[in-house]
Amino acid sequence: MKKLTFCVLIWAFLSSSALAQRSELGVFAGGAFYLGDLNPSGLFSQTQPAFGAVYRFNLTTRWALRANVLTGVVTADDAISGTPERNLHFRSRVNEFSIQAEINFLTYFTGSQNHRFSPFLFGGVGVFTFDPWTYIRNSYNNLDRNAGRIYLAQLRTEGQGAPENDDYPAFPGVYNTTQLVIPFGFGFKFSLNRTFSLGVEWGMRLTFTDYLDDVSGFYVNPGILLENTGNPNSPIMADRSLNGPQVPGTQRGNRNLRDWYSFAGITLTARIGSGPGMACPAMQQRRADQIRRHYHRMR
């Protein structure tokens, strides 16, 4: 019985110590931007602040699992993106939770003197929430922030959910502001000392919606929009063109392409628990020997 107790004690100590020292907890700070109908190709265009929290579990010196909770604002404006006559604008806070796998190109672990740097790739799956909104423009065609935010999803600016008719055989469905996302990217990580690790990374997010910016398909008859929502802002926010009202059925966006967003920035993580962790199994063996000697003194 004493031998069994001793074995369980050794196993529990080594397991808890190893698990703790393989774990890292930290923060993310950087920026977020979006690619879609209002910004088709401008990488890092109109970047806004982003931040969050990171948990990493190092499976080996090459592989790790990671959980992220990130938040940031994405925005785009036709006046900046090259189509000022359409005159659309949006902003949205993006909140993301994801699980990712990391693969280090080189042997790496926090606290190592010889393996303190590695490029890495990451990819995974997650969910995110968004809720696009805009401002009206004043007589100088500037966004009037004093007038307050106008949230766009509830306005159904492309007739989402409206009943079919002869002119419009099929309207898009009402879009969900909680969606799946596929994050992937690359980065570099540096071991600062026995406890802290610094990372620099850039990740793209493939979404499964074309309404992150509330723009996807075609202009709709204003009367249908008003009847569909009962909100007079619906036709006003749907067609803000500088060159006059657009003919219903005219292209407003590109529904064949999904929207993307991106987080880029730095991470600072700290290894949970003290000791050398994966880097030094000899130290763990010495600790086990200490427990063994203490056990024999108790006999």
Where are these regions (language model features)?
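Outer-membrane beta-barrel proteins
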Residues: 34-40, 75-80, 110, 130-135, ...
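Gram-negative (and chloroplast) outer-membrane scaffold detector with strong preference
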Residues: 63-157
